[in-house]
Regions:
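An acidic/histidine-cluster motif and surrounding catalytic segment
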Residues: 2-210, 214-470
């Protein structure tokens, strides 16, 4: 072989080297374009990952449904719980979110209680939501709700009432007492049942349900915050245990609000994610208009500066105090909290036999102890009505359930009540038959002073023109 003559192998590598050199030269000539393309690719990848992160996480996340293990108890069954409250992790209500064990395990009992009290006085009073039921034509009640919520810092949601023209006998449950309920009472029951049904379907945390004529104290948030610690004490005092939970795959699952707040070996602990410890009750009434005597001795009395002194609890004179008690059966559904277990029970009872108005159904279930229920005396909420003699009674505006007259006030109506309006700077008062009401600062009565920033003496100038008499 002559010097300088290429062998086959040498020629092959020479071609590879030439190709590689050409590739490098190509890359160098277009390197800026390649870099831009690479940057675009990286940005698109980040965008796609961020956009679909939740979906990807749920795809690869281990299921939280119970693992089916035949026979007996097992670690798999103990550690994998069905989550009945998917909405609870979205916030709101009692602190908003799943109560993971590590979340509070470093906190002292005092810190836990302080956080529970804070959440019990939040904008939904520690509940998942506050819903009020209102007829679509009652704009006056809509406005009264808005004013109270505005002044007291509450976050409230409207729940449509069921109107008379929406009631079809074919869609009503059976009853052993045909003709017992008026159409308005059927609609009232159904409006409450719609909320119970939603809670049962979605296994929602407790909701506070209000009638649209509910009234409360201007300082309702601090009142409920103060109540919270005493309510926990009350549950401990009566050795409360968690109620039966029949939700799917969970007859004894009490992780519905996160870590259970109860313990078989110790006292009930505060749960900031569920300040009212709703696994211990079905119904908690804070606005009944009457209460029966049954179980009245199962109670806890505590100091509350917002309660005017002088009320009587079954013959015993009280100071500035409030009573937490085991309910003896309520009348009126002005304001009550309901847990998902209570919602399911009430939904079932009405579906089986709709033989009474909604508050009497509740009363019967409480008195028969089918509902685990607690209440307050005096209640922290009550019904309002218009001051007499201003023309609203003539319209039938004092009650929806009994049916209004649906006519305007006659031009020649006698209306002496407007003198009271001018003196008191309010058109609202608590209903006369609510003898147990004890507001220190009823929000609606304080509305003119709070919102206008002036006393009753200025009201006349706003309502009446002294020159024209209008």
């Amino acid at each position: 072989m002559l010097l300088g003559e290429q062998t086959g192998t040498t020629g092959h590598f020479s071609k590879i080297s030439s190709s590689f050199s050409a590739l490098v030269a190509h890359w160098r000539s277009y390197r800026h374009i390649h870099r831009i393309a690479l940057v675009i690719f990286v940005l698109l990848t980040i965008f796609v990952l961020e956009r679909y992160r939740s979906a990807l996480a749920s795809t690869f996340q281990t299921s939280t449904d119970p693992i089916a293990v035949p026979g007996g108890n097992s670690a798999a069954q103990d550690n994998n719980h069905y989550e009945p409250y998917p909405e609870a992790n979205q916030g709101g209500g009692g602190g908003g979110g799943k109560h993971e064990g590590s979340k509070y395990e470093q906190m002292t009992p005092e810190q836990l209680l302080e956080l529970s009290q804070k959440n019990a006085g939040n904008s939904t009073l520690g509940f998942h939501a506050i819903k009020y039921i209102n007829m679509k034509a009652r704009y006056d009640r809509e406005d009264a709700m808005a004013l109270q919520a505005y002044m007291s810092g509450l976050d409230i949601e409207d729940a449509p009432a069921v109107e008379a023209d929406e009631i079809d006998p074919a869609g009503m449950p059976p009853t052993h007492r045909p003709g017992r309920l008026r159409v308005g009472e059927k609609g009232c029951w159904r409006a409450h049942a719609n909320i119970w049904s939603q809670m049962t379907r979605h296994r929602l945390p407790p909701i506070l349900i209000l009638e649209s004529d509910a009234a409360w104290d201007l300082n309702i948030r601090s009142i409920m915050s103060n109540l919270n610690t005493h309510f926990i004490d009350f549950l401990n005092q009566i050795n409360s245990t968690a109620v039966h939970d029949p939700s799917y795959q969970s007859p004894n699952n009490h992780n519905v609000h996160g870590s259970p707040s109860y313990s078989d070996n110790g006292p009930i602990k505060p749960n900031p994610d569920d300040p009212w410890l709703s696994e211990h009750w079905d119904l908690f009434s804070i606005g009944q208009c009457f209460e029966y005597s049954q179980d009245r001795e199962i109670k806890l009395v505590y100091d509350d500066e917002s309660v005017p002194a002088g009320k009587e609890y079954w013959g015993k004179k009280m100071g500035k105090e409030r009573v937490i008690r085991k309910s003896g059966g309520i009348t009126c559904t002005t304001a009550y909290a309901i847990s998902h277990t209570g919602a399911a029970k009430l939904l079932l009872r009405g579906a089986m036999d709709l033989d009474n108005p909604v508050d009497l159904l509740i009363r019967r279930m409480v008195m028969s102890r089918d509902l685990v229920a607690y209440s307050l005396f005096p209640p922290v909420m009550a019904q309002w009505e218009y001051i007499g003699g201003i023309g609203m009674a003539e319209r039938g505006a004092q009650s929806d359930i009994n049916g209004g007259k649906h006519r305007d006030t006659p031009e020649d109506a006698d209306m002496p009540g407007w003198k009271d309006v001018q003196e008191k700077a309010t058109i609202w008062q608590t209903k006369g038959h609510h003898h147990d009401v004890a507001f220190e600062r009823m929000a609606l009565k304080e509305a003119w002073t709070e919102i206008m920033g002036e006393g009753p003496e200025k009201l006349g100038e706003s309502l009446w023109n002294p020159e024209t008499g209008d």
